[in-house]
């Protein structure tokens, strides 16, 4: 691909970004989040953080103090995939510590943010990265986890969930001002996030960007994928598909 073509793709992306910010429908979902006005974790309280990536899992027990969050215990990292909602909920139940009441979920899939009872939940909008989650699309992920844990353990927990790119963007606030930050993840999938202002963030769901010429290999990969016609930019750039370009 020539440099001029890369520049053209960049210009198209910027146009899509500006149009989405103006409220127009574009290939970028442009999912806006607002920061919660109050934390759900008390000072001195332990909570559990789970990272559900496109192909990996991470777990940590953390403690919140007045001025920082400390990792008390960081555990294994392993590959994972979920075909159904049941598999996902059973996995969460198996990994959730019995000693915590709050679960923070870093979730690598497109979710629509929903504030409920003072905490951030998310409705799973679709499945990317050739994932499954059958039965979970269209549901509030945090609420489903809370209900499942209560049925299994007779214990009430609070779950807060955000897209992984939003989590990455927020982590930058520990070192930089919001106006200096943007976040990008190029792993199993592809996504970007930006700040609109001090309290507003946007998950672009960049995988859906389609204002570019597909490669010959990309067209074949798309046709053979679980969701043809969707996440076209991701299918040209991300780890779940990139190796296939060299096999065709």
Where are these regions (language model features)?
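Low-complexity, highly charged intrinsically disordered N-terminal segments
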Residues: 1-10, 104-106, 119, 127
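Residue-level signal for inorganic ion chemistry
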Residues: 59, 105, 246
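Gly/Thr-rich phosphate-binding beta-strand-loop-beta motif of the actin/hexokinase/Hsp70
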Residues: 33-72, 113-114, 178-198
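Short amphipathic alpha-helices and their capping/turn segments at secondary-structure boundaries
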Residues: 46, 85-101
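Active-site core segments that coordinate phosphate-bearing ligands/cofactors
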Residues: 37-39, 169-171, 175-184, 190-248
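N-terminal charged helix/coil linker that caps or initiates catalytic domains
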Residues: 1-48
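Short glycine-rich phosphate-binding loop at a beta-alpha junction
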Residues: 47-50, 99-108, 159-160
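Glycine-rich phosphate-binding loop and adjoining helix at the ATP-binding site
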Residues: 72-90, 111-176, 180-182, 200-208, ...
């Amino acid at each position: 691909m020539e440099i001029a073509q890369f520049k053209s793709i960049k210009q198209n992306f910027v146009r899509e970004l500006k149009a989405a910010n103006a409220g127009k429908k574009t290939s970028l979902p442009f999912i806006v989040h607002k920061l919660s006005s109050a934390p759900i974790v008390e000072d001195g309280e332990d909570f559990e953080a789970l990272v559900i990536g496109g192909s990996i899992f991470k777990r940590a027990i953390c403690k919140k103090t007045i001025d920082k969050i400390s990792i008390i215990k960081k555990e294994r990292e392993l590959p994972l995939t979920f075909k159904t909602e049941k598999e996902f909920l059973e996995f969460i139940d198996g990994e959730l510590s019995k000693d915590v009441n709050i679960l923070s979920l870093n979730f690598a899939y497109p979710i629509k943010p929903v504030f409920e009872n003072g905490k951030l939940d998310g409705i799973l909008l679709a499945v990317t990265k050739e994932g499954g989650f059958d039965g979970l699309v269209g549901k509030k992920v945090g609420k489903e986890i809370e209900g499942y844990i209560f049925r299994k353990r007779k214990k009430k927990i609070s779950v807060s969930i955000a897209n992984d790119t939003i989590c990455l963007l927020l982590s930058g606030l520990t070192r930089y001002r919001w106006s200096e930050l943007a976040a990008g993840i190029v792993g199993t999938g592809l996504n970007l996030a930006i700040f609109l202002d001090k309290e507003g963030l946007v998950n672009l769901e960049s995988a859906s960007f389609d204002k570019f010429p597909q490669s010959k290999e990309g067209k074949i990969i798309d046709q053979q994928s679980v969701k043809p016609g969707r996440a076209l930019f991701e299918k040209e750039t991300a780890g779940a598909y990139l190796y296939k370009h060299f096999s065709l």
